[in-house]
Amino acid sequence: MNNQISLNPQPSSLNLILSRTKVRGEYAHGHLSIDGLRICDTLENTNGLAPAGVYPITLIKCKHHSRKMPVLNPNAPCDRCPKCLIPNPSSLNHTLPCWCPMLKPGNGICGRLDGSILVGQFNCLGSLIHPKTVFDPLYERIRKSISRGNKVILCVK
């Protein structure tokens, strides 16, 4: 049995495509699209980038965010999740202590080395605006696709 994921889109899957368009210093801006339709802008830290490739996305309960999050690594080390639980966090904009790439809302990547792919609308170099209003519909689309038994695949270019 072949466990590799095909680079060809599959009809029973939700295919997200992350195209990195601008890389300067520690900022990597890009666009997230579904079936050729641009959905939102992305922002990543170049020191913690997920390598180009194809990743299955799964929803895993994240103790840091206290909710299910779309994670690029289905074999996420959940035994490390207690390390991610920050006592009395002042903000959810903290970095995670281990490399756990996921799609999440956020407006800046300064100091983030956890592989996060932040979604929002491009504002200026290194900044996104309206991250929550962009993330919520994207999350619902991913959640509904998974609940219908479809695969969700992220292709990073």
Residue positions per predicted region:
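Cell wall/extracellular polymer interaction/catalysis modules
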Residues: 2-152
